[in-house]
Amino acid sequence: MPHESRVGRRRSTTPHHISDVAIELFAAHGFTDVSVDDIARAAGIARRTLFRYYASKNAIPWGDFSTHLAQLQGLLDNIDSRIQLRDALRAALLAFNTFDESETIRHRKRMRVILQTPELQAYSMTMYAGWREVIAKFVARRSGGKTTDFMPQTVAWTMLGVALSAYEHWLRDESVSLTEALGAAFDVVGAGLDRLNQ
């Protein structure tokens, strides 16, 4: 891959900056053809500095995902307990996936890399597990059960399916907003969630 020089003052190093730089490279050249050295060079940092933020190249497209999971946890924790499970999950899912207009283009590139790169799919399953754990904990708390119980796990897997199907649709059809796609996908399974409150 050709090396690209950077002009101007280097921005401070953050996981977000490194991931943004990498996403642009992956989108332009393909995940396989971009090396860790390419990313470090484009970000204006040393290879060893990059590995202080990310354990592997596969982790980079996900950005600071632990922070995002904490945000999802916070959204769920702040939902009034009187709100029905279906409405609570729908509200949290939409809020978690709402971005400023300026972020939409970059987020589309990021999700295209994550969902459409075969080499990333095994790693992505480990990341999805963390996301499902947050959902399952919330459902278990609402139902008075354990996170590992069948019902919370089933709801968590279902919510992952909702999110992934919505993102796939959003990537295929750029005329559809992400919130529209997520809302429509959620409503397909919403009736089943309603029955959990009965």
Swiss-Prot record:
Molecular function in Gene Ontology: DNA-binding transcription factor activity; transcription cis-regulatory region binding
Gene: mftR
Residue ranges flagged as DNA-binding region: 35-54
InterPro entries per the UniProt record, alphabetical: Homeodomain-like_sf, HTH-type_TetR-like_transc_reg, HTH_TetR, MftR_C, Tscrpt_reg_TetR-type
One Pfam match: TetR_C_14
Domain HTH tetR-type span(s) in chain numbering: 12-72
Name the UniProt record assigns to this protein: Putative mycofactocin biosynthesis transcriptional regulator MftR
Gene3D superfamilies assigned to the protein according to its UniProt record, in alphabetical order: Homeodomain-like, Tetracycline Repressor, domain 2
UniProt superkingdom: Bacteria
Role: May regulate a gene cluster involved in mycofactocin expression. Mycofactocin is a conserved polypeptide that might serve as an electron carrier.
Keyword Transcription regulation: yes
Record's keyword annotation contains Acetylation: no
Coiled-coil ranges per UniProt: none
PROSITE patterns assigned: HTH_TETR_2
BP-aspect Gene Ontology terms: regulation of DNA-templated transcription
Lineage, highest ranks first: Bacteria, Bacillati, Actinomycetota, Actinomycetes, Mycobacteriales
PANTHER family hit by this protein: HTH-TYPE TRANSCRIPTIONAL REGULATOR RUTR, MYCOFACTOCIN BIOSYNTHESIS TRANSCRIPTIONAL REGULATOR MFTR-RELATED
Keywords carried by this UniProt record: DNA-binding, Transcription, Transcription regulation
SUPFAM superfamilies xrefs: Homeodomain-like
Species assigned in the record: Mycobacterium tuberculosis (strain ATCC 25618 / H37Rv)
